[in-house]
C-alpha cells in the first residue's frame, strides 16, 4: 500500500469537505440572513405569536415601523411575511398573484365549511376555480347583483320606517338597525327570505353569529401542531362540532324547503327573483354547468355569503356613520349633495346614486381608515418567489397584507389619520383593488367576488339615511367623544353601540 498516496488522498478529501462545508454555511447564511426579510427576535415554540396582541393590525404596523414594510414573522412553526406597503401588496396580489393564490389550512374553517369547500378558504386548484366561477358568473355577476335591487330598496325602506317609528324615543341605537338591515338583505338574497326563530324554531341569527366568531377564533394547533390536543381541554373542538351540526341542520332545512317549493306545479319564479339557493340547485341539477356541485359545496358557498356579506357590509356602514357623526362638516356636505340630487323626491332609488361623488368619497375614506378586513385572509406561496425583486421567500410561506397600515401610510396619504373625503374627489382610486393604496375587498385571484354587491348596499343605505334624517349625538356628547374603539373579528367592528338622535327631514 502506498501510504503517502493514501494520506494525500485523504488530505484532498478533507480539504474538499471543509470547502463544501464552508460554502454550504456561507450560502445558507446568505440565503437566510441577507435575502430573507428582517425579522423580530422570536421565542422558542411560540415564535412571534406573543407580539400580535389583541389588535394584530396595530401591533404589526408598529413592528413594521421598526423592521420595515416587509418583515418575516414566525407564528409558532409557520413562517409569515407581513406586507405593510403599497409596493409589497402589489407584488403579492398582482405581480406574483399566481404564486400566492392558495390558502393555508385552517382546521376550524375545515370543520365549519365542509372541508373548506367554499370559495374563501378552499385551496387553489381545479375545485376552487370551478366554485369561484359559479359565484362570479351565476351568483354575483353584474346582472345578478342588479336583480337584487328590489330587495335592497325594500329592506332599506323598512329600516327607514323603523327608525322613523323610533324617533319618539330620545336616543336610538343606529348600529342595531344597520345590523338588521344587512342580515335581512343577505338572508333574502342568499336564502330567499328572513328566518324568524318563533317560526322555524331555529335562531338563525345566533347560529350565524357564533359561526363568524368561531371562524375567527385562534386555534393553537394551526400554528403549533403538536399542541392541537389543547383544543379538547378548552372545549373548542366540542363547540366547533356543535355549531357545525346546527349550521348543517339549518341549511338542510332551507334547501329542502326550496326543493319542495320548486316541485309544486303552481310555483313559477322569474330568473330575476331567484335567490342563491335557487341558482345553486339549478347548477346541481346540471342546468347551468357540467360541474358536479355536491350539497356540501352548496352549503359552504351559502356560508361564505354570510361570512363575507353580513359582517363586512354592516361593519362599513357602522364605521361610516360614526365617521360623519364625528365630522359635522362632512355630514352637512354629504346631506347637501344627496338632498340636492334627490330634487325633492320622496324616495331615493339606485338610479339616483350615480352622480353622488361625495357619497362615494365618504365611503372610500371610511374604508381607508377602517377596512372591514384590517388584515386580508392569509395567502400561502406555492413555490419559492422573490419579493420586491430581492427578498427570497420559500414555498409554503404565508403572507399577511396589512390593509389597515397601508391605508394610514404617510408615504401614500397626506395627513393619513384625518377623515377627509375630499382626498377622493377627482382621482381614479376605486374600491375594487385596482389601486393598491385602497384594498377593502382585497385584489387579484383571491379578491372578494362580492364587492359590487356590498358597495350597492352601502351606497343606497347611506344615501337614504342622510336623505331622510338629521342625525345628532345624544345631549352632552361631543363629536370627538364618540367611542371609536375597535373590536377585532372576521371584520374589525366598532366595539360600542352607535347612539344617535334621529330627526325626520321635512325639506
From Swiss-Prot:
Residues the entry annotates as binding heme: 448
PROSITE patterns given in the database record: CYTOCHROME_P450
Keywords: Heme, Iron, Membrane, Metal-binding, Monooxygenase, Oxidoreductase, Transmembrane, Transmembrane helix
Membrane spanning residue stretches: 3-23
Cofactor: heme
Protein function: May have a role in maturation, such as during flavor formation or other metabolite production specific to aging tissues.
Full protein name: Cytochrome P450 71A4
Protein's gene: CYP71A4
